[in-house]
Amino acid sequence: MTATACYGIIPARYDSSRFPGKPLADIQGRPMFWHVWHRASLCPQLQQVVLATDDGRIAEAAHALDVPYVMTRSDHPSGTDRVFEAATLLQLDEDAVVVNIQGDEPALEPRMLSELVRPFAEDAAVQVTTLARAISPQQAACPDVVKVVCTAGGDALYFSRAAIPYCRDGQSGAPCMGHVGLYAFRYQALRRFTQLEQSVLERTEKLEQLRLLENNIPIRVVETAYRTHGVDRPGDIDVIINMIRENEG
């Protein structure tokens, strides 16, 4: 394997229509972003994990807790764009691997990040990676669960909110795989992604990863057995606290 420098960046914005101030939500006496940073920092492949925010309140809390952070612009259309600005401010090398770590996953399993970055050390041609896991037929039918189908070599063919693959004969066939929204990019691939216009399929499915596929940028998909649980609303905090207690136990 070739040694590859890997960095984790956590985009954290204060404004949220469903949960304003979410990164600062208290979980067992610490803000949510601290838990995400702490869990990600347990991944041995990541040389550094940094918070990327445009909000002074989040920056002040990060400073108080000794969490590395960078201040970014407030006009980014997506978290991926914020991650790219942060990577640029950190002056990362062209071949560095940048992991986009969701800021609302305080019970993140660090081994998922290890799975995510491993292909970069095994194959110099890999530009982007993500994760997927097996799901039930009921989950496959839900448009909120994004599905992915892959080539024999593990690269994504397509992501969709529809049930793919569709089993015409109603018998068991290829398993349904649900996409897990973690991404890692080589720095130059991340830069190119942010320079591309939104694609037709991206706008249709409301899935930004389709921009990569439509522009012939392959995405290596790694199967994982681990699960994540994001925080969308204040009521999700209790679930997260139970997950953190299980991890600590």
Curated annotation (Swiss-Prot):
Record Pfam families: CTP_transf_3 (PF02348)
Catalytic reactions of this protein: 3-deoxy-alpha-D-manno-oct-2-ulosonate + CTP = CMP-3-deoxy-beta-D-manno-octulosonate + diphosphate
GO MF, any single term: 3-deoxy-manno-octulosonate cytidylyltransferase activity
Gene Ontology BP annotations: CMP-keto-3-deoxy-D-manno-octulosonic acid biosynthetic process; lipopolysaccharide biosynthetic process
Alphabetical list of SUPFAM superfamilies matching this protein: Nucleotide-diphospho-sugar transferases (SSF53448)
Subcellular location: Cytoplasm
Nucleotidyltransferase recorded as keyword: yes
UniProt pathway annotation: Nucleotide-sugar biosynthesis; CMP-3-deoxy-D-manno-octulosonate biosynthesis; CMP-3-deoxy-D-manno-octulosonate from 3-deoxy-D-manno-octulosonate and CTP: step 1/1; Bacterial outer membrane biogenesis; lipopolysaccharide biosynthesis
Cited function: Activates KDO (a required 8-carbon sugar) for incorporation into bacterial lipopolysaccharide in Gram-negative bacteria.
Family: Belongs to the KdsB family.
Name used for this protein in its record: 3-deoxy-manno-octulosonate cytidylyltransferase
